Amino acid sequence: MGLPWYRVHTVVLNDPGRLIAVHLMHTALVSGWAGSMALYELAVFDPSDPVLDPMWRQGMFVIPFMTRIGITKSWGGWSITGDTVSDAGIWSFEGVAAAHITLSGLLFLSAIWHWVYWDLDLFRDERTGKPSLDLPKIFGIHLFLSGVLCFGFGAFHITGLFGPGIWISDPYGLTGKVQPVDPAWGAEGFDPFIPGGIASHHIAAGILGILAGLFHLSVRPPQRLYKALRMGNVETVLSSSIAAVFFAAFVVSGTMWYGSATTPIELFGPTRYQWDQGYFQQEIDRRIRASRAEGLSLSEAWSRIPEKLAFYDYIGNNPAKGGLFRAGAMDNGDGIAIGWLGHAAFKDKEGHELFVRRMPTFFETFPVVLVDEEGIVRADAPFRRAESKYSVEQVGVTVEFYGGELNGVGFNDPSTVKKYARRAQLGEIFEFDRATLKSDGVFRSSPRGWFTFGHATFALIFFFGHIWHGARTLFRDVFAGIDPDLDAQVEFGAFQKLGDPTTERQGI
């Protein structure tokens, strides 16, 4: 036929058998990629420190999604929570990967079978003897089956009735674990941070899908609507399918970037807004005040702060700090976190407690400014020493650490104080190993950032794809010069069957 590369899909337009074959092959590729990617990530993943080197710091992409729906154990004897396990069962990380690769192989074979045996009686209209698909009926079948799957996931898997549940954690990502979830049927179910809404929405959407599927199986579309929406043209299916996919991609881009119960920070890392709003800093401050009210010293109060919570309060874990074109995991940037040095508390010689202004998300450099509790500037690291009034040396700033590895240690040497003030701009101060991975010191984004960027980008591309194919199917007669009321089932540019010796050969 001599088709150009961008028109090769024409060969499956009027060929239901091979249309199924290429979709089977596509699903085989998707499933095979998922399984292979899981095995690769498991080969490079280090589960030894779930607090300071969690999966999202290591750039894991598919492991968080498996963990989210209840897979936490490995045949290697470890679990996501850091425990050792003796019997991981069949549904371990490796088991899920193997299942996907096995499915991929079976789909590959079935794609080949359908490509070879394309001309089945099933695909021929009994009245005309020509290839035909009952697209409204197929729509009903798919709607019904996806509704059953959706309902089953919500009613059984998430609730723990027949399944493990899903990953549940506290608002600060400290106590996460897989557990069953009760559906939330009230207004609270619409709160994106309430896990019960995930169960109730899957159950409700599943029931709706089942009912809608049965409706489309039992009720034929009116003839005028059938013709108006081009329901007999498979490109209509393509257009509406692309619409469903791009809409879903936009939605999950939002739930990932802004955060929700479906994207726990223990699995995907914190959001940029948690840094912007001082979310973890406020929780740490609340805990310190509570401990002080109990009569504990500052050192004792800070020693009670979980290292995990302190690590979230560090700008290097902000997904917006890594450039989109800086490849690699977070660990390849600032390094592998080894330990928390403690909270740096600054004072001037007059006894004012000073706080370092934190670096905003979109700054690469930021002046070192220390303010008191009223926001008045008391000290800084000046750019021009000749004009300085608030330099660390002039003001006599000292630093003392509470909690962490330097608990109780103080410094009054100006160069050391300035070093820690500069590091305090980035949140809580941690020690990093940059040698192991040859980390370059340039921040990277987390899987949260990559997922959002990828899905938002593809959603935009798919949006244009929906417009393109929708226009092609609606205005097909205008574009192709084919009368829409023509009885013969033909496609412009596809009158013969490619590779079929029984079809008449003619120039197009």
From Swiss-Prot:
Question: Where, subcellularly, is it found?
Answer: Plastid, Chloroplast thylakoid membrane
Membrane topology of this protein: Multi-pass membrane protein
Spell out the GO cellular component terms annotated for this protein, sorted alphabetically and separated by semicolons. chloroplast thylakoid membrane; photosystem II
Superkingdom of the source species: Eukaryota
Chief site of localization: plastid
GO molecular function terms listed in the Swiss-Prot or TrEMBL record: chlorophyll binding; electron transporter, transferring electrons within the cyclic electron transport pathway of photosynthesis activity
For this chain's record, the cofactor binding note is:
Binds multiple chlorophylls. PSII binds additional chlorophylls, carotenoids and specific lipids.
Query: What GO biological process terms does the UniProt entry carry, in alphabetical order?
Result: photosynthetic electron transport in photosystem II
Sorted alphabetically, which Pfam families does this protein's record hold? PSII
Transmembrane stretches in the record are 21-36, 101-115, 140-156, 203-218, 237-252, 457-472
Which SUPFAM superfamilies did the record assign? Answer: Photosystem II antenna protein-like
- The entry's keywords: Chlorophyll, Chloroplast, Chromophore, Membrane, Photosynthesis, Photosystem II, Plastid, Thylakoid, Transmembrane, Transmembrane helix
Role of this protein: One of the components of the core complex of photosystem II (PSII). It binds chlorophyll and helps catalyze the primary light-induced photochemical processes of PSII. PSII is a light-driven water:plastoquinone oxidoreductase, using light energy to abstract electrons from H(2)O, generating O(2) and a proton gradient subsequently used for ATP formation.
- Summarize subunit and interaction data from the UniProt record for this chain: PSII is composed of 1 copy each of membrane proteins PsbA, PsbB, PsbC, PsbD, PsbE, PsbF, PsbH, PsbI, PsbJ, PsbK, PsbL, PsbM, PsbT, PsbX, PsbY, PsbZ, Psb30/Ycf12, at least 3 peripheral proteins of the oxygen-evolving complex and a large number of cofactors. It forms dimeric complexes.
Family assignment from sequence similarity: Belongs to the PsbB/PsbC family. PsbB subfamily.
What's this protein's name?
Answer: Photosystem II CP47 reaction center protein
